[in-house]
């Protein structure tokens, strides 16, 4: 599910959960546990990457449909906890985006301190609204902190995914990297960030991201309504319609 490797104080966490590392309850809990384990003083920085041509395809919509609202009731808080663990990890966290990073995969990458995407055909975006599900407060504020308002509205309302150059121009990623060099470059960045005083880095990171968390607290009432919407029958109708349309397109 998650492959772990340590090298010179850098912990590499590789998502290896099915073909596209779609997010479900088990992957979320496993990754949360990995971030807790990364509190070990021997770990100086974390690199998060994926397998094959996908970093992560986001929330496992087929699992949502299969297991229904009771599963969603358990999963949504875990998704929030995962993003919070990534964002607030006091150590440098580098996303080595090895391919497609869609929806929750895009947001997971955005929660990292530095984002490097491999050159190629990978796409990144947030199609949640097109799927028919609203954004919880934390994912929304993470993306809003990375992408300027005009680009943000374009991504959200269109639901489109973008390729590497447009993603960099928007702020979704920080840099691009040639094929075959992704982990080397991510390690270079992680080592550079890890060379900074750990205490100073942690305090600076806390100050940098505290406005995101404050805004989430302010949106608590709205977030409760969003969570409730994830449990409603019409949301599952929206997801089914989106999946049906997506499957039909892939068969053409």
Regions found by a protein language model. Give the residues of each.
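C-terminal long alpha-helix characteristic of the crotonase
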Residues: 117-122, 173-221, 246-252
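Well-ordered beta-strand positions
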Residues: 114, 154, 158-160, 166, ...
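Conserved CoA-thioester-binding segment of acyl-CoA-metabolizing enzymes
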Residues: 1-49, 84
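Glycine-rich beta-to-alpha active-site loop
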Residues: 84-131
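Hydrophobic, secondary-structure "cap" segments at the distal end of domains
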Residues: 140-150
């Amino acid at each position: 599910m998650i492959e772990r490797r340590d090298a010179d104080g850098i912990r590499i966490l590789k998502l290896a959960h099915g073909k596209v590392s779609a997010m479900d309850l088990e992957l979320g809990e496993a990754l949360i546990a990995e971030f807790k384990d990364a509190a070990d003083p021997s770990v100086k920085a974390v690199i998060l990457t994926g397998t094959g041509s996908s970093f992560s395809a986001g929330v496992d919509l087929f699992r949502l449909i299969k297991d229904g609202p009771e599963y969603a009731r358990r999963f949504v808080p875990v998704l929030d906890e995962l993003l919070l663990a990534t964002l607030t990890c006091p150590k440098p966290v580098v996303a080595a985006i090895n391919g497609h990073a869609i929806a929750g995969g895009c947001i997971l990458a955005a929660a990292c301190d530095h984002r490097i995407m491999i050159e190629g055909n990978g796409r990144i975006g947030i199609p949640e609204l097109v799927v028919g599900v609203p954004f919880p407060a934390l994912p929304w504020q993470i993306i809003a902190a990375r992408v300027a308002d005009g680009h943000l509205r374009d991504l959200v309302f269109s639901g489109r995914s973008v390729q590497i150059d447009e993603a960099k121009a928007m702020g979704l990623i920080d840099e691009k990297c040639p094929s075959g060099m992704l982990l080397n470059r991510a390690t270079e960045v992680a080592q550079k960030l890890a060379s900074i005083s750990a205490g100073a880095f942690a305090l600076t990171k806390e100050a940098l991201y505290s406005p995101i968390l404050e805004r989430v607290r302010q949106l608590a009432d709205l977030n409760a309504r969003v969570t409730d919407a994830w449990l409603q029958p019409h949301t599952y109708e929206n997801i089914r319609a989106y999946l049906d349309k997506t499957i039909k397109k892939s068969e053409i």
